């Protein structure tokens, strides 16, 4: 019996109890909450349902809890239901009912934890979207991990997810990038507003190797050549780096196409005509302050040129034309103002601003031996995705970035994340999976196939804890999707790994027969428990884009 099964049973029982006493079952919530108590002595699960609905039903919370306890006590799979405090209900499950979740896990396999709650919802998930003027820095790296994990989690709930990278190949930063390449190719100092780092020289060398005449071309032609070739080479590097990191996109959208196609002008004229832009001081403005921005924003400047937000508005209109029900933007810590701007754009086009969600990620810092690591060997200024992967590897990098809420800044201790110790979270979780795989390999030497597992014998404290933790997984994935918080999956995996390590460390809980002893129904039941644990660990790691090693 999973927590969801118990919640359904509890609601059905409560509806019957209320109806039998002439009380209205309509006061019951659509979803009943059951939680695992912090103190195991309080049962396997607890609920405050009686306290939540008693007043609406016209009765006393303890009385209602007592009626529920009496009815639940007679239900299949329930060992006991006891009233506590002002109306809490503590519930214990029979071992066989509790163990049934293991069979569900093995039957579902990689599908355990998936759901259809977002079936039919078309989501555009835009993340990373780093400028093609240099390697991806740590902020973009965080989104490469978190965004990819969120896409996997939303898809696991049935959503149709389009992962999109907005390629900022239009604007002054591209001109500065081109000027930096020209300077490197012609032996000139880096411009004051240019980009430095070994990668600039490397790209310039590649361009000159392909176009030997490039340094001596007329200035305008030279600038355009280095601009076009440089952007193409830099973005090829970015795509390759992301792919090696395990993050790929369905759509790479070029900002420049919005201007070249006239989409920006068309979007602005549409909003002018609808009255959703207003004119002041010779410029055209959008009322983004009504949606959380600190001030309204200029869309068309007084000189007639488009402000940066004009491209954002046209880009949203493009997404809208592709039929997305929800657009999620994952932006850096310095982009808080974009929340109001993007929601204002949605409202201006007649959409519910709630169809736009903006997630803001805080800063990431690297630490080694207690000291901040601030310089990249290739970028020259900031630490990059390549630097992080070189230092700790892909799995550790992805996990380190995804296990924290994006609302908090992160310090990644390079010594910790390269250690093979339980204090290293990714090692702790992956080692748990490797241990389950090892038992599976060793079990192949015994005749488990002819023995029927008796899940009712899984009564040890460590076994019960592990089973209940396994049963929580679907709820964790669902909450990670609805709250847009992939770190919930990572923290859950650490909890599951801990429960498994405690189970296997107890030498009395043998999975494999001792010596020449035959496989017993209890041995077989414990192997089911191990295999179910292995499956859930693998499923959760897959959602995070982290490998599940068979041995370590």
Swiss-Prot record:
Name of a matching Pfam family: Arg_tRNA_synt_N
GO annotation terms (biological process): arginyl-tRNA aminoacylation
Predominant place of localization: cytoplasm
NCBIfam families: argS
Keywords linked to the UniProt accession: Aminoacyl-tRNA synthetase, ATP-binding, Cytoplasm, Ligase, Nucleotide-binding, Protein biosynthesis
One GO cellular component term: cytoplasm
Gene this chain is encoded by: argS
Listed name of the protein: Arginine--tRNA ligase
């Amino acid at each position: 019996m999973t927590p969801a099964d118990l919640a359904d049973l509890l609601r059905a029982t409560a509806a019957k109890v209320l109806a039998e006493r002439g009380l209205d079952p309509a006061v019951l919530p659509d979803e009943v909450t059951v939680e695992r108590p912090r103190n195991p002595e309080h049962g396997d699960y607890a609920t405050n349902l009686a306290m939540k609905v008693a007043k609406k039903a016209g009765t006393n919370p303890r009385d209602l809890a007592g009626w529920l306890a009496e009815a639940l006590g007679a239900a299949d799979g329930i060992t006991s239901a006891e009233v506590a405090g002002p109306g809490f209900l503590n519930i214990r499950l029979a071992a066989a009912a509790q163990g049934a979740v293991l069979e569900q896990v093995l039957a579902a396999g990689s599908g355990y934890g998936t759901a259809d709650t977002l079936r039919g919802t078309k989501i555009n998930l835009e993340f990373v979207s780093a400028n093609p003027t240099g390697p991806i820095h740590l902020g973009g790296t965080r989104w490469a991990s978190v965004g990819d994990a969120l896409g996997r989690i939303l898809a696991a709930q049935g959503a149709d997810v389009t992962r999109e990278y907005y390629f900022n190949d239009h604007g002054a930063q591209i001109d500065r990038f081109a000027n930096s390449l020209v300077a490197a190719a012609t032996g000139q100092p880096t411009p004051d507003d240019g980009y430095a780092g070994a990668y600039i020289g490397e790209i310039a060398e590649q361009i000159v190797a392909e176009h030997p005449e490039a340094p001596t071309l007329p200035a305008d032609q030279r600038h355009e050549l280095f601009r076009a070739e440089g952007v193409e080479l830099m973005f090829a590097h970015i795509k390759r780096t992301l792919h090696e990191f395990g993050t790929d996109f369905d759509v790479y959208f070029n900002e420049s196409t919005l201007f070249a196609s006239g989409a920006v002008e068309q979007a602005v004229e549409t909003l002018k005509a609808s009255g959703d832009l207003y004119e002041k001081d010779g410029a055209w403005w959008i009322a983004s302050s009504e949606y959380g921005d600190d001030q309204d924003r200029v869309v068309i400047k007084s000189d007639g040129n488009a402000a940066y937000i004009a491209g954002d508005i046209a880009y949203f209109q493009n997404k809208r034309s592709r039929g997305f029900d929800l657009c999620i933007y994952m932006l850096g810590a310095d982009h808080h103002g974009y929340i109001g701007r993007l929601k204002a754009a949605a409202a201006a086009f007649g959409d519910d601003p709630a169809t736009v969600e903006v997630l803001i990620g805080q800063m990431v810092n690297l630490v080694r031996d207690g000291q901040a690591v601030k310089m990249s060997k290739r970028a020259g200024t900031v630490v990059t995705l390549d630097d992080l992967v070189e230092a700790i590897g892909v799995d550790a990098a992805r996990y380190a970035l995804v296990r924290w809420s994006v609302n908090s800044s992160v310090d990644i201790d390079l010594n910790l994340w390269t250690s093979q110790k339980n204090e290293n979270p990714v090692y702790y979780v992956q080692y748990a999976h490797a241990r389950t795989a090892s038992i599976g390999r060793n079990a192949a030497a015994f005749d488990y196939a002819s023995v029927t597992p008796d899940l009712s014998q899984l009564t040890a404290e460590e076994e019960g804890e592990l089973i209940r933790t396994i049963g929580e997984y679907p709820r964790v994935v669902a909450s990670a999707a609805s709250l847009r918080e992939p770190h919930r999956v990572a923290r859950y995996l650490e909890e599951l790994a801990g429960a498994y390590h405690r189970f296997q460390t107890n030498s009395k809980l043998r999975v494999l027969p001792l010596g020449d002893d035959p496989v017993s129904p209890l041995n077989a039941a414990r192997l089911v428990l191990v295999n179910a644990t292995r499956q859930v660990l693998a499923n959760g790691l897959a959602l995070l884009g982290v490998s599940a090693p068979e041995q370590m």
